[in-house]
Amino acid sequence: CEGCGDCGVQSNCVAVTPVETELGRKRAIDQSACNKDFSCVKGFCPSFVTLQGAQIRKSQTAQLDLPQMPEPVLPNIDGTFNVVVTGVGGTGVVTIGAVLAQAAQIDGKGAGMIEMAGLAQKGGAVHIHCRLANRPEDINAIRVATGECDALIGGDLVVSAAAKTLGLTKVGRTGAVVNAHDIVTGEFTRETEFSIPTDRLSLALQARLQDRVQLLDSTELARITMG
């Protein structure tokens, strides 16, 4: 790879990701995002090699040595407990919201969820609003209003630090856990030297939520444990 980016230009695919090396920016294929249309091989590049009849070797996984985790202290729900889940289409954001709502119903509580995906298909911004309550009748409107988010689960740093998301949060009320992994946006398919301003996005979250935000590379954790 010479870092020209023609594979991304030809394929218009966000599975072509940047890799920063001591020899400059190179390219790699994010296997979890690849849709296998192989249009990236149309790029004028000798580093793509096609193997006929080869089988994909699954990467080795590791077992995380986690300490014994205590049971969480559940908050007292006065009215509703409002959860916002953000991320990129195609990565399970809607599934997380559905699991939360279903778990609440199984536990005898009320739950309501809406998907705010708009035109987002694979790779687009997705917002899930989920309200939990002791009784279903305690939930009037499902959409979380400005400053009413109690918990933010961020699957993507860009979406989580956007003004639309931060407007739902409130200092002293909202707690957040956000994936700090660099997930490339569609801009990278058009601008080969585009870089996500990770530091600025992280600072925006920390300035808003102060010590109530936790940033971690959950994408790398998933790769290590799931392959």
Summary of predicted features, one role per range:
Residues 2, 86-87:
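Short conserved micro-motifs on helix faces and helix-strand junctions that flank
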Residues 2-28, 33-58:
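Iron-sulfur cluster-binding cysteine motifs and their immediate structural context
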Residues 49-85, 91-227:
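Active-site cofactor/cluster-binding pocket
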